[in-house]
Swiss-Prot record:
Originating organism: Clostridium botulinum (strain Loch Maree / Type A3)
Name of the molecule in the record: Foldase protein PrsA
Primary location: membrane
Lipidation, N-palmitoyl cysteine type: 23
EC number: 5.2.1.8
Residues lipid-modified (S-diacylglycerol cysteine): 23
GO CC, any one term: plasma membrane
Subcellular location: Cell membrane
């Protein structure tokens, strides 16, 4: 009797294992994959189709295929890139879900009629960009992964999100004294015309090399000649000449730019350390213009500072909201 019970138990266990394994081995249908849950935010599901049909994700896939070929998604490298992109966009979808939930909580969601009206207005604004050419508008929608319906739904969500962000940042203020401080510290940004300087430099790897270069230049050796001999930058063939540079050039290393601005016309710097190595900088000439009066730029400065503070406040608030939310991600369902 005991043997029979044991056998029955083993058989039942075997059936369970086989059933479980079989279920795990059965490939999901495209419909089932589309409906599979990839994340939950406070109990609300984000499904695989929300990600796969997301216009941002579609654009990424389209760009990858154009660059690497139609089979890119099937390669190991392609799968890794797709997974990484999906994770990034999923994080954006989670953020949007948190914001939309907050919209309900804060009671800032307009009534359906008003929301549809606002969304239609935004659609018409987009159409106006294409001179109300319906064909061009539809071609652009298709190329960006939208349909008319999904665009409108997207815009409705963005309207709600904008209202939530406004609510979260409504306490942000910028005083005149904040603008005055920024103006005093960044006067080169507020000139009648952009200040520029004509710059040459010599780039070497170590500080010792830079000191040797400076010593040669202090001994009145020709800057261009020394640059051609020792510089490790592409500008060496031009004697280290970089040409005219704006004081607000965001493409330059900030440390390099700050050191160059501080030099007088004709001056040569001591070694300046940046991420690229050690530079010796020479200012060949400068064009500096009068600074605008504070009152003429005050409102622009306040607007800029307010936007920056609002961004900081929003980032802090969304991190706080996400931390307080119950968020679960189902990684295995992403691919």
């Amino acid at each position: 009797m005991r043997s029979a019970k044991k056998l029955l138990s083993v058989l039942c266990l075997g059936v369970f294992i086989l059933t479980f394994t079989a279920c795990d081995m059965v490939e999901k249908t495209p419909e089932a994959k589309a409906k599979s849950t990839i994340a939950k935010v406070n109990g609300e599901k984000i499904q695989r189709k929300d990600l796969d049909e997301n216009p941002r994700f579609k654009q990424v896939v389209s760009q990858m295929k154009m660059q690497y070929g139609e089979e890119f998604e099937k390669s190991e490298q392609g799968k890794e890139v797709i997974k990484e992109q999906k994770s990034q966009i999923l994080d954006e979808l989670i953020t949007e879900k948190v914001l939309l939930q907050k919209g309900k909580e804060l009671k800032v969601i307009p009534k359906d009629e008003e929301l549809n009206k606002e969304a239609d207005k935004k659609v018409n604004e987009i159409k106006a960009v294409y001179n109300n050419d319906e064909k061009k508008f539809e071609e652009t929608l298709k190329s960006t992964g939208f349909t008319k319906e999904t665009l409108k739904e997207y815009l409705k969500d963005q309207i709600v999100i904008e209202k939530v962000i406004n609510e979260a940042t409504k306490g942000v203020k910028v005083e005149d004294k904040d603008a005055q401080k920024y103006y005093n510290e960044n006067q080169s940004m507020f000139t009648e015309k952009p200040n520029t300087m004509n710059v040459s430099h010599i780039l070497v790897k170590t500080e010792d090399e830079a000191k040797k270069v400076k010593k040669r230049l202090d001994a009145k050796e020709d800057f261009a000649k020394v640059a051609k001999e020792v510089s490790q930058d592409g500008s060496k063939d031009k004697g280290g000449l970089l040409g005219d540079i704006s004081y607000s050039d965001s493409n330059l290393d900030p440390t390099f730019l700050k050191a160059a601005i501080a030099l007088k016309e004709g001056a040569i710097s001591n070694p300046v350390h940046t991420q690229f190595g050690y530079h010796i900088i020479k200012i060949n000439s400068k064009k500096e213009y009068p600074v605008k009066k504070f009152d003429a730029v005050k409102e622009d400065i306040k607007k800029q500072l307010k936007q920056e503070k609002q961004q900081e406040a929003y980032t802090k608030k969304i991190e706080e909201w996400k931390k307080a939310s119950k968020i679960k991600i189902y990684e295995k369902n992403l691919l």
